[in-house]
Amino acid sequence: MGHRFLRGFLRVLLPPLPLRSPHLKLSLEPVAPSKRPRSHLMAPPRIGTHNGTFHCDEALACALLRLLPEYREAEIVRTRDPEKLAACDIVVDVGGEYDPQRHRYDHHQRSFTETMSSLSPGKPWQTKLSSAGLIYLHFGHKLLAQLLGTSEEDGMVGTLYDKMYENFVEEVDAVDNGISQWEEGEPRYLLTTTLSARVARLNPTWNQPNQDTEAGFKRAMDLVREEFLQRLDFYQNSWLPARTLVEEALAKRFQVDPSGEIIELEKGGCPWKEHLYQLELGLSPAGTIAFVIYTDQAGQWRVQCVPKEPHSFQSRLPLLEPWRGLRDEALDQISGIPGCIFVHASGFIGGHRTREGALSMARATLAQRPAPTPAPNPMVQ
């Protein structure tokens, strides 16, 4: 993990004063007095959730809460007994009520239809929230600020808050609420190794003599907490810094090639695609990028085609068809560019020993393309 992230995590271990989030539309009022006896008021707080078979959403909800200083030592009370739940400081995924003022975060009641968009106007996500999404919505900015070692007002917190929801929490919400990955048609493959599926497999099997779920639930919290922290670390220390590299590359694109359709990244291997699509929207003059060149770990050059969409295997402009699937001397001969290493069979990427050679591969493809038609930007709906 990066040093900044570790410093942030140390702040969780040595908690600062809690901060209120200015980002949330629903403010959290002080919690109603606990129904616990007065003699227990100094006891660790209690997080209530249901017992029996557990799922990814409440495991993640509890794990996220325990990353906050005020709940780090919290007791997890797994029960469906209303009296025991009433004595808890916060209740997730059980109880049949959503009342953030009293810290009740269930989503199973018929009346509950909330999404990130409905509770936080301006957010685009329309997936019905699970207990994980509810906890993330109400505590996420505060949690990320503490983990990242900064304030909630830091723009990085807002950026990573959105990124972590879209790429981590929303899937948990969707799976728990039974929302199909596809709106129409048959899925082309099965998702069997998702976070939710791995949590589900920690439950006892139907034919195990011991049906106790307590140990499995603790393992589930460890699993989702570790994965959440790893993802946040990646977005903070890899994904976010890559934006600066893409911005710089776009600013220099006409120095790389007069077409303005080839950019050169200072460092290869960075996650550039999503940043490119977003930054293209503000280009002046307007345009889209066809190729990205960069060095690989061996110091050789790659020329990669920009895909039509972030996760698409189709390129805006693939490398020339006669080159595809060829290597070394055979590729040199047919391309007329000495020093080639390879071109992938689909044409989405190629390799060359030199920067000039990689540029020549991109330029030759640009020169032989059909009459230009502006490539759509996937960020434009």
Swiss-Prot record:
<feature type="transit peptide" description="Mitochondrion">
    <location>
        <begin position="1"/>
        <end position="47"/>
    </location>
</feature>
<keyword id="KW-0540">Nuclease</keyword>
<keyword id="KW-0496">Mitochondrion</keyword>
<dbReference type="GO" id="GO:0005654">
    <property type="term" value="C:nucleoplasm"/>
</dbReference>
<feature type="modified residue" description="N6-acetyllysine">
    <location>
        <position position="273"/>
    </location>
</feature>
<feature type="modified residue" description="Phosphoserine">
    <location>
        <position position="120"/>
    </location>
</feature>
<dbReference type="Pfam" id="PF03690">
    <property type="entry name" value="MYG1_exonuc"/>
</dbReference>
<dbReference type="GO" id="GO:0005739">
    <property type="term" value="C:mitochondrion"/>
</dbReference>
<keyword id="KW-0539">Nucleus</keyword>
<dbReference type="GO" id="GO:0005730">
    <property type="term" value="C:nucleolus"/>
</dbReference>
<comment type="function">
    <text>3'-5' RNA exonuclease which cleaves in situ on specific transcripts in both nucleus and mitochondrion. Involved in regulating spatially segregated organellar RNA processing, acts as a coordinator of nucleo-mitochondrial crosstalk. In nucleolus, processes pre-ribosomal RNA involved in ribosome assembly and alters cytoplasmic translation. In mitochondrial matrix, processes 3'-termini of the mito-ribosomal and messenger RNAs and controls translation of mitochondrial proteins.</text>
</comment>
<dbReference type="InterPro" id="IPR003226">
    <property type="entry name" value="MYG1_exonuclease"/>
</dbReference>
<feature type="modified residue" description="N6-acetyllysine">
    <location>
        <position position="267"/>
    </location>
</feature>
<comment type="similarity">
    <text>Belongs to the MYG1 family.</text>
</comment>
<keyword id="KW-0597">Phosphoprotein</keyword>
<keyword id="KW-0809">Transit peptide</keyword>
<dbReference type="GO" id="GO:0005759">
    <property type="term" value="C:mitochondrial matrix"/>
</dbReference>
<dbReference type="GO" id="GO:0005737">
    <property type="term" value="C:cytoplasm"/>
</dbReference>
<keyword id="KW-0007">Acetylation</keyword>
<dbReference type="GO" id="GO:0004518">
    <property type="term" value="F:nuclease activity"/>
</dbReference>
<keyword id="KW-0378">Hydrolase</keyword>
<dbReference type="GO" id="GO:0005634">
    <property type="term" value="C:nucleus"/>
</dbReference>
<protein>
    <recommendedName>
        <fullName>MYG1 exonuclease</fullName>
        <ecNumber>3.1.-.-</ecNumber>
    </recommendedName>
</protein>
